[in-house]
Amino acid sequence: MKMRCLVLSLLAATSIASFAQTATGLSPKWEELTGPDFITAIHQSQGVCILPFGIIEKHGPHLPLGTDLINVRYATEHAAAAEYAVIFPAYYFGQIAEAKHEPGTVSYSMHMQLDLLQETTDEMGRNGCKKIIIVNGHGGNEDLLPYFAQSQLQTPHDYVVYIYRWHGNYPGRPAEHSKIDMHAGESETAHTMVARPDLVHQDRAAQESGADQARLHLPQDVYTGIWWYARFPNHYSGDGSVATLELGQSDMKAYVGDLADTIRAIKADQTSLQLQNEFFEESKHPLDTKQ
């Protein structure tokens, strides 16, 4: 079984690299390009660059710490094989304070997260990435990244930041068997069975509980940072033991297709940067803005 998983993983990695390079003659991966090839790649991608955003955190007792990074890069690399874009190297400097009690979690300060992401997108922009798609592979970033995108209006930029998060809603999706599936559960385990089957230890998935402990009783409209720990102290939500390869393959195919379509749409978008420039110009003289 382990040998079969290793073979599947190696075949998947080989297919990504060969498909991407056959379609364009260039690797989509920033770190694999030479300096001269990087210039060609930026032109080939029409200035569209992707920042797949993962995290390092516990994923139940059965999935690797880098699950979010592994899966988001798998989807991004396959999408870039279908619609060429330059992919930034591994990035996992996001919000994961709620898992600091678990082994292996790497949690950076709020200021570090925002400063590093700003410096990274600035450097991407300086290198010709005028349309930067941050592909979010981690649920803990769902508030961080829209805020970051909104904060780009504070200072003029010659690039646009787009945030993409695939939510898995599509016709014909195989039925799930779990009532709760929020972290390291059925769907995420299924996705990793496709991206890195050799790192999935499904036989261990039932060693810890992924049930909602419901230890906090507050009004529905109240938010507090300890909510996740109150519900899922094992940092596990759902049941990875019921995951199937069928679900993983179906989801990943839909994910890759939707992301490839998104890359095409952003390549065609000429309005966002135009309006952003207009906004920056008007913001210099707000009293002159027509009322």
Regions picked out by a protein language model, each given a short descriptive name:
Residues 1-7:
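Bacterial N-terminal signal peptides that target proteins for export
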Residues 21-111, 115-131, 139-291:
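Extended, histidine- and acidic-residue-enriched regions that form the cofactor-binding/catalytic faces
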Residues 7-18:
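Bacterial N-terminal signal peptides
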